[in-house]
Every structure is written in C-alpha cells, then in structure tokens.
C-alpha cells in the first residue's frame, strides 16, 4: 500500500501526549487529522443511531465502510472535535455506553478490516497527521514520517490524574498507575498489532518535557524527512 499524500504517524501509549501533539501539528501544517482511537467509538455510536445490532457483522461492516466522520482541530490543545454525520459527538462517544459498544464491534474481524480501509481513506492532500497505536506499523506502514511518543508510567498516571482532577473527579493516582501498567502490558504483548515503535520511527520520551519542546523536536524531524510547503 502506498499513501496518496504525505502522512505523519504519531503512535504511543495513552498519556504520552499524542493527542495534543497531533492537534498542534495538524494546525501548524494545515493538514487533515485522524484520531484512530475514536474510530471504534464513532462506529458504535453510528450503529446505535441506525439501530444496527452490535452482533450483526455484515451490517456493521457496511456501516464502517461508509462511516461519515471528521476530526476537526479546535483552538485549544485538547479541543479535537469529532463530527459524525454532521453532528458534534465529541462528548457522546466518551460515554460508558459507547465504550462498551466499541469493545463489541472491535472484536469482529470484518469490521476491523473495513475500518482499516476507512482509516487509510483519510490520507488526502495536503497531508494527514494520524494519531494512534499502530499507525506507523500497520495502517500507514509506508508513511515518510513516523513518531513514537512515550513517557514513564508514573508520568502518564500523573497527567491523567491532573486531567481528572481538573474535571472534578475524585480519583486515586495509585489506581490510575496500576491501570496504565496493566494496559501497557496488554497492548505490548497482544498478538495483533502490538504497541511497538516502527523500526524507522523517531522515539521521543516526553517525561518531564513541556509540550512546546516536544512539538519543536517533532517539527525539526518532520523538516528533515519531508518538504512541507
């Protein structure tokens, strides 16, 4: 598979700063944005809207192939908007109902294949910034620029703790840390699309580094790999 337009992939575990960097990078370049982590939630919500049974693999595959979804950059670091069929569903897809439904549809092989093709269809001029966990290894394996962001589990737990505290949630940081360690183990050791850097990816440890410094490193690397007009 060859990409039709330049693609920058940004992979890494939750809490490493992928979402913020991808948003800022897409804004800076004026490129399209793909939040692959939201795709299954969006499909699940579309299925709910269209009364499609979550066990109906054939109907879900058809729905996935024609999924009308956009990811728009906002004016703030965490302001990526998810638009489904013209409706802002940024908040809706984060509900527990959507999360549970997403887990069900993600288990269907034909649906996964259809969503893989749908994600690749986001590649369009002038370019695409793809945020995910297997963007550089599976979805856009021939992308000219691959970034892998990581950070210590402790750092990521602290970031998540701060986010939840700011939203008024009462959480325990030790529990968040345990969940992150468990998810890391699951993601890196799974048989299909394990969470690992592509062989040709630039790996950046964001522990203790401000977002502007990370963005500077990324932009410098992008400039070394491709010509951006």
From Swiss-Prot:
Could you state one GO biological process linked to this protein? pyrimidine nucleotide metabolic process
UniProt keyword list: ATP-binding, Cytoplasm, Kinase, Nucleotide-binding, Transferase
The record's annotation in HAMAP family points to:
Cytidyl_kinase_type1 (MF_00238)
- Can you name this protein? Cytidylate kinase
Q: Which gene encodes it?
A: cmk
Q: Mind naming one GO cellular-component term on file for this protein?
A: cytosol
Reply yes or no: does the keyword Magnesium apply.
no
Q: Which Pfam families does the UniProt entry name for this protein? A: Cytidylate_kin (PF02224)
Residues holding ATP: 12-20
The text of the family note is: Belongs to the cytidylate kinase family. Type 1 subfamily.
What's the source species for this entry? Answer: Shewanella frigidimarina (strain NCIMB 400)
